[in-house]
Curated annotation (Swiss-Prot):
This protein's domain notes: The tandem repeat domain, also called neck domain, mediates oligomerization.
C-type lectin domain segment(s): 263-378
Disulfide partners: C256-C267, C284-C377, C356-C369
InterPro entries linked: C-type_lectin-like, C-type_lectin-like/link_sf, C-type_lectin/snaclec_domain, C-type_lectin_CS, CD209-like_CTLD, CTDL_fold
Extracellular side of membrane: 59-404
GN (gene name): CD209
Cytoplasmic face residues: 1-37
Effect on the protein upon substituting D320A: Loss of binding to ICAM3 and HIV-1 gp120
Effect of N350A: Loss of binding to ICAM3 and HIV-1 gp120
Entry protein name: CD209 antigen
Motif (Endocytosis signal): 14-15, 16-18, 31-34
One of the GO biological process terms: positive regulation of T cell proliferation
Protein source organism: Homo sapiens
Repeat region (Sequence), residues: 96-118, 119-141, 142-164, 165-187, 188-210, 211-233, 234-257
Binding-site list for Ca(2+): E347, N349, V351, E354, N365, D366
């Protein structure tokens, strides 16, 4: 038994020595003899104790190294902070610029609200109107020109009704219109212009001396008022004088509307544009007239002369639309046999459904009703009485001529 134990102890000793070498311990005789004396279980506990002790020693040996690393890290942080401080110092100007930008932004918003937008707008509008008003104030030379024109007009009107004088008055009124058109108060300027235009037409038709005298008196008062411009009260006085003058002119007799021609108690309008026969009837009806119906040889000669003088093909109110070959006027009356002499040679021939009559050259011709031609409207002239009561009453309104 003793012999067998010895080799086993030797083997155990060798094993323990190998394990201790693996853990970094040096072999000693005392430890080896101690291991040989101890059992296998206590040996494991001893090994664990030595292992823990060795690990603790290793950690303790590393502490100075960790402190050194921390110090290096702090030095690096310090250097970074130093560099950052220098960089921040360079950014001070930029931050100030940013601050200025923000201040300007706030100032812009504040100025946008000062003092009250509505009041600023109102002030702007008032200044704009004031500028326009000042720009329209008449120059003294213009006022003097108006005064001179009215003085001349007064003398000219007193010498009516010579035709040359009427023409001269027309030219003077045209110049007066341009001068008055520069006065302030634009709406009243326009009204003055329109009134002077109507006055021009009325003066051109004046035959009665009493009416001339009335206009002379009105113009005399107007001259006195214009001579004292540009005071606003005087301008108002001129406006009132022109209003009175308008009333006087409206009481004058106008047998025919403007741009119509008077002949034997009727008014005639010769168009400046072309329409077909049916549309020509409509155009005349719109102004209280009808496509011309010829009632006498004198009227025929007058109208034929008007048409041939302008070298136009012009519709009249005659057709055979209701029954081929039976010619009838638009008022329903038949064509009298005595009027058949006015047809041109070989007419009417009804070539290609020609059912409407026209003035052509020195006579009449039939043509297609859908062709566009000039036309003539006819209506009765207004009666002009010399009775004073009739003279003082306003003339009936006359419609404008049809679209030319």
């Amino acid at each position: 038994m003793s012999d067998s134990k010895e080799p086993r102890l030797q083997q155990l000793g060798l094993l323990e020595e190998e394990q201790l070498r693996g853990l970094g311990f040096r072999q000693t005789r005392g430890y080896k003899s101690l291991a040989g004396c101890l059992g296998h279980g206590p040996l494991v506990l001893q090994l664990l104790s030595f292992t823990l002790l060795a690990g603790l020693l290793v950690q303790v040996s590393k502490v100075p190294s960790s402190i050194s690393q921390e110090q290096s890290r702090q030095d690096a942080i310090y250097q970074n902070l130093t560099q950052l401080k220098a960089a921040v110092g360079e950014l001070s100007e930029k931050s100030k610029l940013q601050e200025i930008y923000q201040e300007l932004t706030q100032l812009k918003a504040a100025v946008g609200e000062l003092p009250e937008k509505s009041k600023l707008q109102e002030i702007y509008q008032e200044l704009t109107r004031l500028k326009a008003a000042v720009g329209e104030l008449p120059e003294k030379s213009k006022l003097q020109e108006i005064y001179q024109e009215l003085t001349w007009l007064k003398a000219a009107v007193g010498e009516l009704p010579e035709k040359s004088k009427m023409q001269e008055i027309y030219q003077e009124l045209t110049r007066l219109k341009a001068a008055v058109g520069e006065l302030p108060e634009k709406s009243k300027q326009q009204e003055i212009y329109q009134e002077l235009t109507r006055l021009k037409a009325a003066v051109g038709e004046l035959p009665e001396k009493s009416k001339q005298q009335e206009i002379y008196q009105e113009l005399t008062r107007l001259k006195a008022a214009v001579g004292e411009l540009p005071e606003k009260s005087k301008q108002q006085e001129i406006y009132q004088e022109l209003t009175q003058l308008k009333a006087a002119v409206e009481r004058l007799c106008h047998p025919c509307p403007w741009e119509w021609t008077f002949f034997q108690g009727n008014c005639y309008f010769m168009s400046n544009s072309q329409r077909n026969w049916h549309d020509s009837i409509t155009a005349c009806k719109e102004v209280g007239a009808q496509l011309v119906v010829i009632k006498s040889a004198e009227e025929q000669n007058f109208l034929q002369l008007q048409s041939s003088r302008s070298n136009r093909f012009t519709w009249m109110g005659l057709s055979d639309l209701n029954q081929e070959g039976t010619w009838q006027w638009v008022d329903g009356s038949p064509l009298l046999p005595s009027f058949k002499q006015y047809w041109n040679r070989g007419e009417p021939n009804n070539v290609g459904e020609e059912d409407c009559a026209e003035f052509s050259g020195n006579g009449w011709n039939d043509d297609k009703c859908n062709l566009a031609k000039f036309w003539i409207c006819k209506k009765s002239a207004a009666s002009c009485s010399r009775d004073e009561e009739q003279f003082l009453s306003p003339a009936p309104a006359t419609p404008n001529p049809p679209p030319a």
